[in-house]
Swiss-Prot record:
Main location: cytoplasm
GO function terms (MF aspect): 3-phosphoshikimate 1-carboxyvinyltransferase activity
EC number in record: 2.5.1.19
Enzyme class: transferase
Keyword Amino-acid biosynthesis: yes
Catalysed reactions listed for this entry: 3-phosphoshikimate + phosphoenolpyruvate = 5-O-(1-carboxyvinyl)-3-phosphoshikimate + phosphate
Function field: Catalyzes the transfer of the enolpyruvyl moiety of phosphoenolpyruvate (PEP) to the 5-hydroxyl of shikimate-3-phosphate (S3P) to produce enolpyruvyl shikimate-3-phosphate and inorganic phosphate.
Descriptive protein name: 3-phosphoshikimate 1-carboxyvinyltransferase
GO BP: any one term: aromatic amino acid family biosynthetic process
Keywords: Amino-acid biosynthesis, Aromatic amino acid biosynthesis, Cytoplasm, Transferase
Active site: 313
């Protein structure tokens, strides 16, 4: 297996221009495809997940022009639901941000479309979304295991009253919200259980509004969406930098700055993961906010005990930053780590122990106590981009670290290690 050894880093200092947000990129692409008019998306993320969405849209007959560097995309809107005249199978890799929204959007009208993906995608639950779509009239079959992809979609979603479980993934609600305006009837979505990752719903509602559709949000418990609407292209849309990707660089600044500045996000960002910077500040780092940047300067870091439900992806970065904090750090309410690219709670606990940390892994929490000195280790990445990026922070010590399968960062940040090297001074 390919590996990359990072030598100890004495200091980090500099500016990182962030790649586009994965969450925003794939939502914007789908809405642009469903809308009336042509949309020009800039700062689009070039990554595996976005390529899977683009490939699916192309197979569905959507016309778009992509720049050579794949960060500018001109999408000719379809002016309504996406249809396939023939049977179609779409392979979506391990892209949850493509699988969930497409599973809903392709239930409009009548289709015969199979959505499938990598083996890990077939382990990521989709049952709650399918149940909700069926309540709205959709005809959906599981082709292998019940409640998991691959699924066959035969259309039929007309709206009405639907109930969706919000406790596993906010992407199920996102998928329903983006599809509902194009259904013939009004849709009332009621949430069962606690809604996880609320800020991701805010991204969805913001994008829908950008494309001309308002949703009545009743305290995140009920959402009322008028049917028989159409999305309207905003013309041009700038995709924000990826706030989850920012977390590694901001944490590096907190641990071994200098000052690290990330651009492309700022105090008014639509992404909830910018709140990660508040956690670093609470730990003792110095954080500065601008309209289009966040910067972080080294401070003496102390452990925190916090509920991380609102920033599940960026919270992983705190688990490795905890190796540099005084005391025991506890991250709570993170059950949904278990249904991401890999079981991230298990993976994180396993790999933190390799570098010498004392770790307690609960059903929905993790507790990390750093060792006196980090140990040299080979870090397994579980084909999970965030594991690879999180554990790069171990090199901000006097211990080198080896990352196995470093190219898995291609899911959201293909040149991550080059960017980290650019702001690093080796010990």
């Amino acid at each position: 297996m390919e590996s990359l050894t990072l030598q100890p880093i004495a200091r980090v200092d500099g500016t990182i221009n962030l790649p586009g947000s994965k969450s925003v990129s794939n939502r914007a692409l789908l809405l642009a495809a469903l809308a009336n008019g042509t949309t020009v998306l800039t700062n689009l993320l070039d990554s595996d997940d976005v390529r899977h969405m683009l490939n699916a849209l192309k197979a569905l007959g959507v016309q778009f022009m992509l720049s050579d560097d794949r960060t500018r995309c001109e999408v000719v809107g379809n002016g309504g639901a996406l249809k396939s005249a023939t049977e179609l199978e779409l392979f979506l890799g391990n892209a949850g941000t493509a699988m969930r929204p497409l599973a809903a959007a392709l239930c409009l009208g009548s289709n015969d479309i199979v959505l499938t993906g990598e083996p890990r995608m077939k382990e990521r639950p989709i049952g709650h979304l399918v149940d909700a779509l069926r309540q709205g009239g959709a005809q959906i079959d599981y082709l292998e295991q019940k409640n998991y992809p691959p699924v066959r979609l035969r259309g039929g979603f007309t709206g009405g009253n639907v109930e969706v479980d919000g406790s596993v993934s906010s992407q199920f609600l996102t998928a329903l919200l983006m599809t509902a305006p194009l259904a013939p009837q009004d849709t009332v979505i009621s949430i069962k259980g606690d809604l996880v990752s609320k800020p991701y719903i805010d991204i969805t509602l913001h994008l829908m509004k950008t494309f001309g559709v308002e949703v009545e949000n009743q305290a995140y418990q009920r959402f009322v969406v008028r049917g028989a609407q159409q999305y309207q292209s905003p013309g041009n849309y700038l995709v924000e930098g990826d706030a989850s990707s920012a977390s590694y660089f901001l944490a590096a600044g907190a641990i071994k700055g200098g000052t690290v500045k990330v651009t492309g996000i700022g105090r008014n960002s639509v992404q909830g993961d910018i709140r990660f910077a508040d956690v670093l500040e609470k730990m003792g780092a110095v954080v500065t906010w601008g309209d289009d940047f966040i910067s972080c300067t080294q401070g003496e870091l102390n452990a925190v005990d916090m509920d991380m439900n609102h920033i599940p992806d960026a919270a992983m970065t705190i688990a490795t930053a905890a190796l540099f904090a005084k005391g025991t750090t506890t991250l709570r309410n993170i059950y949904n780590w278990r249904v991401k690219e890999t079981d991230r709670l298990f993976a994180m606990a396993t790999e933190l122990r390799k570098v010498g940390a004392q770790v307690e892994e609960g059903e929905d929490y993790i507790r990390v106590t750093p060792p006196a000195k980090l140990q040299v280790a080979e870090i397994g990445t579980y084909n999970d981009h965030r594991m690879a990026m999180c554990f790069s922070l171990v090199a901000l010590s006097d211990t080198p670290v080896t990352i196995l399968d470093p190219k898995c960062t291609a899911k959201t940040f293909p040149d991550y290690f080059e960017q980290l090297a650019r702001i690093s001074t080796l010990a």
